[in-house]
Amino acid sequence: MIKNIRFSIGADNESKCVSIAKEYLIKNNYPLIEYGSLAGDGLDWVEVAKKVSRDVQQNKSDFGLLFCYTGTGVTIVANKFKGIRAALCNNQEVAEGARKWNNANVLGIGLMSVKESDIKGILSMWIKTRADDSELKNIE
């Protein structure tokens, strides 16, 4: 695992999948800034997505991790922020492609479609995959 990566993580509702993701990041010593149900601040999904996106935009975090029921809404909100490249990734292959080919910096997860048993693999793939510099010209 690559160390010294900071995450801002947010969800509007608690779920086992969100808890597994948080525990995985803590276990692997990734610093976290938490929003929404994770922080007990009662923010809705729109505000959670905005706060996580601002953290990444302002370099308070290297990556954002957003959860909502479909994952679509938080991803759309995140992509409204300059410099944010949010990708909805519900499996390892999509997470790898989003990082490699699109240099995505915010990971959206749909709670209705990701199995609890898959979340660690998605996060691991996201963290270990580096952007392919030859592809960056296509997204800038």
Where are these regions (language model features)?
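Mid-chain, well-packed structural core segment of small domains
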Residues: L66-F67, T72-G108, M112
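Small-residue-rich anion-binding loops in enzyme active sites
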Residues: M1-Y30, N138
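Short, structured active-site "lid" loops
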Residues: V48-T70
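C-terminal binding/interaction regions
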Residues: S8-G10, E14-C17, Q92-E140
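Solvent-exposed alpha-helices and their adjacent loops that cap or buttress functional pockets
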Residues: M1-I2, V56-K60, R99-W101, K115
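A short beta-strand-loop structural module common to alpha/beta enzyme folds
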Residues: P31-L43
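Short active-site oxyanion
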Residues: R6-F7, K60-G64, G83-R85
